[in-house]
Amino acid sequence: MNILSIETSCDETSCAVTQNGKKVLSNVVFSQIKDHQIFGGVVPEIASRKHIQFMTLVLQQALKEANLTPQEIDLVAVTQGPGLVGSLLVGINAANVFAYTYQKPLLGVNHLLGHIYSAQIEHEINFPALVLLVSGGHTDLFYLTDHLQIKPLGTTLDDAVGEVYDKIAKNLNLPYPGGPLIDQLAQQGKDTYHLVRPYLKNDNLNFSFSGLKSTLVNLVMKQNLKDINIPDL
């Protein structure tokens, strides 16, 4: 079975073609990083416009790299949420048009399930399984007893880890996206600043990162940024 998958939940236009659920025939991604860098984060209106601009090109390239015609696609899958509404609509509309034009079945997918099941491309998931899902807009802990039998154990009560990285990077005058560079700098630093370690003494499995973000932002505001050795943070 050849599946065409379309993902536009945030700021990347992506189409992939997989065969029998395992073999990736193509995976084409148009990144908008440069378009959002000057703002230090994703601007929803810009994201949706860029999806409109590049959706058709990305889809055509995915089919080309997979060496398949539209008629050879057996199923169309598309992210239906969660995500930015304007961005999601572009992908959903493209999937609907493709499915209607070529008379293919259409499947809407929760993109968090996409994150979870991407692990299965290389390794089978052995149940029961514990999943820590960390992405740009989500930080969640799930317990899986079987396929699609998912119990939420915990989630962030405020900011997702990815959001915290980007907001902190902006306050430190670091480029967007902040995560990769902050990770690199952290490898070089010393444990000089003892920042708050959030939400450790609680009887649940939720997360909270707003306190850590606020502590660092306040530290930067109180001191001259030039006097702070960023890797030590």
UniProtKB/Swiss-Prot annotation:
Positions annotated to bind Fe cation: H111, H115
Presence of keyword Phosphoprotein: no
SUPFAM superfamilies referenced in this protein's UniProt entry, alphabetically: Actin-like ATPase domain (SSF53067)
InterPro entries for the chain: ATPase_NBD, Gcp-like_dom, KAE1/TsaD, TsaD
CC per GO annotation: cytoplasm
Enzyme class: transferase
Keywords: Acyltransferase, Cytoplasm, Iron, Metal-binding, Transferase, tRNA processing
Record's catalysed reaction(s): L-threonylcarbamoyladenylate + adenosine(37) in tRNA = N(6)-L-threonylcarbamoyladenosine(37) in tRNA + AMP + H(+)
Entry EC number(s): 2.3.1.234
Recorded superkingdom: Bacteria
Binding positions (substrate): L133, V134, S135, G136, G137, D166, G179, D183
Cofactor binding comment, as recorded: Binds 1 Fe(2+) ion per subunit.
Pfam families the record matches: TsaD (PF00814)
GO biological processes: tRNA threonylcarbamoyladenosine modification
Entry cofactors: Fe(2+)
GO molecular function terms noted in the UniProt entry: metal ion binding; N(6)-L-threonylcarbamoyladenine synthase activity
Gene3D superfamilies: 3.30.420.40
Compartment(s) of residence: Cytoplasm
Role, per record: Required for the formation of a threonylcarbamoyl group on adenosine at position 37 (t(6)A37) in tRNAs that read codons beginning with adenine. Is involved in the transfer of the threonylcarbamoyl moiety of threonylcarbamoyl-AMP (TC-AMP) to the N6 group of A37, together with TsaE and TsaB. TsaD likely plays a direct catalytic role in this reaction.
Family designation: Belongs to the KAE1 / TsaD family.
Full protein name: tRNA N6-adenosine threonylcarbamoyltransferase
Source organism (scientific name): Onion yellows phytoplasma (strain OY-M)
Taxon lineage: Bacteria, Bacillati, Mycoplasmatota, Mollicutes, Acholeplasmatales
